[in-house]
Amino acid sequence: MSDSYKGHLVIVVALEHYNPLVILRTFGQEGIYPVYVGINYKAPVASASKYISACHHVDSIEQSYEVVMREYGHIGEQDPTKKPFLIFGDDDVYSYYELDHYDEMMSRFITFNAGEKGRVTHFMEKEAIQKCAARHGIPTLKSVVVPTGQIPEGIVYPVVTKSISPVTGGYKSDFFICENEEELKNNMALIKTEKVMIQPYVDKKTEMTIEAFTYNHGKGMFAGVECRYLYTIKGYYSPLFDSYLPKDKELLTKLNSMMEEIGFEGIWDAEFLVDKSDNIWFLEINFRHTPWANPATRGGNPLVTLWCEAMLTGKCREPQDFEPFATMVETVDYAKRVEEMKLCSFPQWLGEFKQCKCTMYYDEDDLEPWNVTVANWDILK
């Protein structure tokens, strides 16, 4: 057991959630037990993992930074060849570090970056990243960005509203499906962000994500898994999805060119909508590790450890192919399919859960987070 990857301490900073749990387990399965700085959230699922060398509980993003610098900032400052890895799982956490403490962070740690202060946060904005995708030939939905409260002329209903960035306004609570202008006006009064993106509503067949990382200022790329939802929920993600190795080389090349333009070094997730005619439409990039990387680990492509290797050596192996399998977010899938949508009975769901190759909370080799999940089931679903 070690707390380091090839002599570099590993630090994970994230809200208490199943996302950092995935990161910790990925490292742990390779004998690396990271430091975890957990920002209190719904339930302490990640900090219950056995794959932690030291755990710090904090109540805010600002406190997380204070702990990281006080306890570990001196390591890279004293010996730049031993800079710790600093890995993030939340947009707002990373954005705070990048906007408020970029120089200190980059001088002391190996971490996600695009070469200059605020550049990653800029491309978190949906308008900026969609324009970038369009420049590289990836289809995007026609969108308009307006000050919240302003109703644009000439749009065709139904439409959806979205916060312009994951670090402003209400983010997911700013999402509404509006069938007409009256509904749009009413929902505008509830939106918290100062600017809102309005897009045509597409009756989707599914959604898909590609989980990947880039290095060498975005020039090198590794795509570890593609996920497609097995059932759709209007205005919500599906917590049950197929997982397999990405096959669309042309799309991967275009994503790589986007990342090279941005200069991003880090783990990321690209999201797409798939319409009834199987056309794909680019939605956004999450410039962070997401739990959808869990099936990449299961398939033999652990993004976090391979990214660390690429950042040290400037190169990376080819992705390992694997047989497709289903991945489940247990609490949310139960709530949606059994309780709300009545798509299956509890015995049927339980059977599928037991057969599922990849789950977010349950891991027979690391059971305490599952015990915490069961004890806080209603909070986490």
Spans of features found by a protein language model:
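ATP-binding N-terminal substructure of ATP-dependent carboxylate-amine bond-forming enzymes
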Residues: M1-N113
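Short glycine-enriched loops at secondary-structure junctions
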Residues: V37-A43, D92-Y94, N216-M221, E226-Y229, ...
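Active-site nucleotide/adenylate-binding loops and adjacent lid/helix of ATP-dependent enzymes
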Residues: V120-M197, D203, N216-G218, K249-T253
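Protein kinase-like catalytic core scaffold
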Residues: V159, M221, N279-E284
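ATP-dependent carboxylate/phosphate-activation module, predominantly the ATP-grasp catalytic core
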Residues: E179-E182, P200-G263, N286-M311
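A short glycine-rich, hydrophobically flanked beta-strand micro-motif that places a catalytic Asp/Glu
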Residues: E265-S277
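Peripheral (often C-terminal) accessory segments that flank ATP-dependent C-N-forming ligase machineries
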Residues: C308-K381
